[in-house]
Amino acid sequence: MPYRIPRLFISATRKSSGKTFIAVGLTAALSARGLVVQPFKKGPDYIDPRWHSLAAGRECRNLDDFIMGRPKVLTSFVAHAQGADVAIIEGNLGLFDGQDLEGSDSSAALAKALGAPVLLVVDCKHLARSVAPLVCGHLHFPGGETIVGIILNNVATPRQEKRLREAIERFCPIPILGAIPRSAEIMIDERHLGLVPANEKQGAPHTVETMGRMMESHLDLDRLVALAATATPLALPDNPPALASKAPLVGGRPVRVGYAADQAFSFYYPDNLEALRQNGVELVPFSLLDEQPLPQVDGLYIGGGFPEMFMEHLQQNRATLETIRTRSELGMPIYAECGGLMVLSQRLIWAGKRVELAGALPIEITMHPKPQGYGYMKIHGTGALPWPPVDQEICCHEFHYSKVSKLGEGVRFAYQVTRGSGVDGWHDGILYHNIFASYAHIHVEGAPEWAPFLARFWRERGSFSQP
């Protein structure tokens, strides 16, 4: 059955052109008009979706062909866009960028698969008449037929805007749907993993509201809504795959799991948290940055984030770190990814500083100026755990500037890495006592058995990881 979902795909001529700024602002503006907006983000990014979620008032969903597969991407899109007035999808990189020369992994390819009209954002810094061949080139490149309008961003003056409009109107058969003036006061700051997360930026809700008002003033929102409605009905493939995040609720003894949710640890996919809840996991948020005692729980889940930005703060919270180490020594099962792996280590070394951390893992972490693991991964099980099986390939991703510089005795590995870096270039998924910690970020729609396995891991006190 074809699904009628008004939708727009926000892309750009290149990376760092203002896609997120435009997409978040557009989402905020449409939401302020009373529309229900469902945001999506292409790729495995954690940070941009936090801004989209804040603007929409509902969770942004990731769409990633490599990790999830195209059928699951389409199924997830339809499932989460149902009931919304409009879906806003933000691409990544430039419209045609990707690793495949034929463009199968590009934003253009995803937009075409979703049947989504594309708005092309053009960063106009230092541009004048040259904007015309830039836009025309995109329109005539394979995949450019999905572009329905241009948004001029970072426009310095009314005079520049006039020249840009004249050039495009003279040479390019495409409407200009808005021109956003340069405004440093509402730009989202960046750091080594991308934008600063919304939960770290002071006044983030006000920033989003300001972005929304700017889009209301400078974009033709009525025309954009009309263009979204022109999207053709989207048909799913025959026998579409089931979504792990929408699986029926599993019975059995509930298990309480504390998950770190603060400025330092915030990298959690909504789909993953929902899948865990569907498997009987009660998720109890806690912070590693305040001095409140850890909740009484059966296990811990420490996701990724930016612990390196809070080194001294974490070090000062010795009571919480020591409680984590003590509970792990007493058998509490702990699952951690990336930043979580880091905080469980003995110490973190960065720019000559040594910070003592939880010491639950016999490892030492060193930060480097360049990425030590970046991009997509492929992993197999080593046989040390029931999941993942040795003969099953899991597609996931990593992005870390840290590296395990010292590895103590007694450590085993859950994953064999066939693409990517992991801990040592060949292995990932450190197993030590009842701790399971990796650099790999898992998305449940690419690994449906992840959530049932972790629920059993916590429920049975990590017995799977025993030698």
Curated annotation (Swiss-Prot):
The record marks H441 as: Increases nucleophilicity of active site Cys. CDD domains: CobB_N, GATase1_CobB. The keyword ATP-binding applies. Its EC number is 6.3.5.11. Pathway: Cofactor biosynthesis; adenosylcobalamin biosynthesis; cob(II)yrinate a,c-diamide from sirohydrochlorin (anaerobic route): step 10/10. The active site is at C338. Residues 256-449 form the GATase cobBQ-type domain. It is an enzyme of class 6 (ligase). It catalyses: cob(II)yrinate + 2 L-glutamine + 2 ATP + 2 H2O = cob(II)yrinate a,c diamide + 2 L-glutamate + 2 ADP + 2 phosphate + 2 H(+). The keyword Cell inner membrane does not apply. GO terms for biological process: cobalamin biosynthetic process. Keywords: ATP-binding, Cobalamin biosynthesis, Glutamine amidotransferase, Ligase, Magnesium, Nucleotide-binding. Its cofactor is Mg(2+). GO terms for molecular function: ATP binding; cobyrinic acid a,c-diamide synthase activity. Comprises of two domains. The C-terminal domain contains the binding site for glutamine and catalyzes the hydrolysis of this substrate to glutamate and ammonia. The N-terminal domain is anticipated to bind ATP and cobyrinate and catalyzes the ultimate synthesis of the diamide product. The ammonia produced via the glutaminase domain is probably translocated to the adjacent domain via a molecular tunnel, where it reacts with an activated intermediate. The a and c carboxylates of cobyrinate are activated for nucleophilic attack via formation of a phosphorylated intermediate by ATP. CbiA catalyzes first the amidation of the c-carboxylate, and then that of the a-carboxylate. Catalyzes the ATP-dependent amidation of the two carboxylate groups at positions a and c of cobyrinate, using either L-glutamine or ammonia as the nitrogen source. Belongs to the CobB/CbiA family. This is Cobyrinate a,c-diamide synthase. The lineage of its organism: Bacteria, Pseudomonadati, Pseudomonadota, Alphaproteobacteria, Magnetococcales.
